[in-house]
């Protein structure tokens, strides 16, 4: 990454503002300029525009060196440069200009590859791709569209060969290309030991042959300058021969005089120049450019005169660049910076989920079980694809539920928070109403901290933040302070900037957008705004106002993605980040005020997303209370779930047993999240009272104690340590199952009703009434099979056959769990099952099988696409159905329960 030396990103605005220094504007004045200065100014402006197009949009600010009282145009060379930068016929769709005094502004909208004209477009903008190809006798640079198509062809070629072979991405065979080169007429010259000065070659330049003459004494520098573009062109086409020392008109051998070069230095210069060429592989190869160099003696009148240098270049499997592509990005941490070759290619064609051909099963699951909410083919460069489970609400439906916009109606939302804030601060309603009096259509979306909602640190002294989304107005973020605070504007600016960036780069908003800021102080006698920098110093064009309800809804749908997104389990399987969306039920729990809800019991049905909410709430705790990682403690019962959470690095994660050891360090702990609490025990002491004491030590500082549990998944009959159900207050419920396929969810519902009708004595009956609200996201196909009256060897063979089927069809061992009733049964039978599987496939190595076999209890809280339950049973018959529920809910897509007895469930 190279930082731009002369472009400066302004840190104190809620937008990306790039200062480009002094620039001469106007066609007449620019034509009078020194050519070098003119070229440097054009480069600065184009590079700044490139950075903003690729980074979510923003503003270029220029100081006009030629003062003018009258409006001036940019200048034709600047307009042409910007038009060439943007791979779109409509420059004005992305660029607007405005002059204010001696400042000139270029307003840049984020690039998006939306193919409105029906053509495919690159994901990012670039000044140069540094990719070349041969066309007849010329080397041609590829423009943005050609580059995108070239890279897409290469990617598709590898993907096609991979899909056919069902294996890892293979190297593309080189033999056929080598045969072509050896049948080339230049091959005979390449094989020669000596040539005569003035000898006429029996062939001319072509798509695979290029002549270059040594016309300078600086032969080494000349070769270095020629090689990058020509080698890139040959390698990216069909390969070819580059001959140094031939006159391209007469086709006569001239060579390079031996007084200017020697044989070894010629080879060294060629090797050095080619070794520096960047390459990118879509396939598994790691090879650089394949070439051979021959330095051939040239004789004149019987004496050695000099040398002819011939480079034979083979066609490259993927892409060869003459240098790193020239493309820029910007952020407030690094300023304006260039992209390296690998990142540029990955962003250019965006190697998203569709490129994960080796994970065909996961791709199938994605296409069959999820609905796309945000596609890479119609979004800004930094966006990740967003999918929702089939049967869950679309982003448009979520927007209407959370942020409904109505014509001729202005609303404060959420209403409950608005009423609560007004009751707590008597002057607040009047203060905000004064600001809103001119708006008749839109929303004021209130939050105790928009910063925390955006995963930033909150700020003490902020009563609330309010986001205005209104007709004929740009989005505006209001921060209301209790007392005057000089850092209030910084907080508001930082929050507004993050919101604007996330609306584009996460939410996929493709319209023009800025977020204005206003800081109000409740204690001010005149209800005036606080002092501080304001983005209003830049007068944005009217096109940045939300013109109508449709534009407001588009922006609010992007906001829904910003607020409700979380990383999907498919991200790890596909090797690229994919986002899912929370349900409204999950979001409402997550939106609770932590200052008011210091303690909460969250009861959730199996597969309703309890652990996701636990992770998200820990992130919110960190930002609300400015916590270090070790201040937040996550406690669960089993080690696998502990390890899963620990890897997220948001908290300190331990098991209950570790938490209850006498020497467990609690000094730094301020907040505690308990997960899977129904399976906790008191054999090592009263964990609940210990956690409660820790989170009540500091009366002046709020400390959080949230407990997630599901009595339906209780897997023992011992005392859990939880308070009586009636004393579990406040309490929230998660009743929508979002994990499992339809047939598995139906099975879960049946077992849940069975448990409710005949609960184990240890479970409070009232806790099971939530099964009446049980529902799931329907539309996901899957398998739920019960096979009975089988012996263990039959089970092992069946599991092996199904594993072979799934592995052959693109699943991996990481997608499969084989669960036994107890750890002893797992230890006793694992080898037999593993042996049967390995007899059929070689895809199970030692690293994978460690995570493939486990006990039902130890696997609690985790999930897999495919789950086999091996002869599930319990010593305590009263909790048999609970254990079955725990087993079945682990399976996302395919569930197989294999039993020795004829009818284990009595359905």
From Swiss-Prot:
Q: Which GO terms describe its cellular component?
A: cytoplasm; nucleus; site of DNA damage
Q: What is the effect of changing residue 281 to A?
A: Renders the protein insoluble
Which residues, if any, are the signal sequence?
Answer: none
- Catalytic residues? 205, 210
Annotated Zn(2+) binding lies at 281, 283, 318
Alphabetized, the UniProt keywords read:
ATP-binding, Cytoplasm, Endonuclease, Hydrolase, Magnesium, Metal-binding, Nuclease, Nucleotide-binding, Zinc
Instruction: Cite the effect that the entry attributes to residue 205 to A.
Output: Abolished endoribonuclease activity
**Residues holding ATP:** 604-611
Question: What's the reported outcome of changing residue 34 to A?
Answer: Reduced endoribonuclease activity
Keyword Zinc-finger annotated: no
Q: Where is this region: N'-domain region?
A: 1-353
Subcellular compartments: Cytoplasm
Task: Give the E.C. number(s).
Answer: 3.1.-.-
Tell me the impact of changing residue 259 to A: Reduced endoribonuclease activity
Q: Which PANTHER family match?
A: SCHLAFEN, SCHLAFEN FAMILY MEMBER 13
**What is written about domains in the entry's comments?**
Shows a pseudo-dimeric U-pillow-shaped architecture of the SLFN13 N'-domain that may clamp base-paired RNAs.
Name the protein family. Belongs to the Schlafen family. Subgroup III subfamily.
Its name, as the record gives it, is Schlafen family member 13
